């Protein structure tokens, strides 16, 4: 793919999900996102009101996480988290799938968990569309499981499938991103996240089929000129 680092900014979710992230860290993240015109900032729910205020006059979206990082919250809690995040100003939701239900073969429960979050975005009292990304945590899945999870997530109505939380045993891998893209086709986005540190690594993910990158190294990626 022929793209310059600075042109990649619109595909990057500039991320700080560190449990030790401070108010100043989030202010810095938002300032960087505004400067480089990233797609969004991806932050923990506690900081959504702050980010929404800091970014209200620009195109950068506020993205937060639901059921993070294990995906083991009840569906009711995930639905509440989603509505609460949107009430506080979130415009994109990255939810962690119910990995245990999926691994147990409880596929109806698995699907309904995802669909409940999608439905919660439509009843949160906002007029704009809320983007939902489902985190598969691919480090715990084999190829057939990745494919099946993608198929079910697509059928549940998500906007993106996403590789990783960044808290698992490994992050995005080229082969997983490629499989995810082949499975969901062009109707659903693919977000690669976890372990993407520079422009070349981000470009590899785009070449594999990703159209969104989640990274804490967004500034490095978009300023990584090789000319």
Question: Where are the model-predicted features located?
Answer:
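Alpha/beta enzyme core
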Residues: 2-36, 48-68, 72-190, 198-227
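Short hydrophobic "strand-cap" motifs at the C-terminus of beta-strands
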Residues: 193
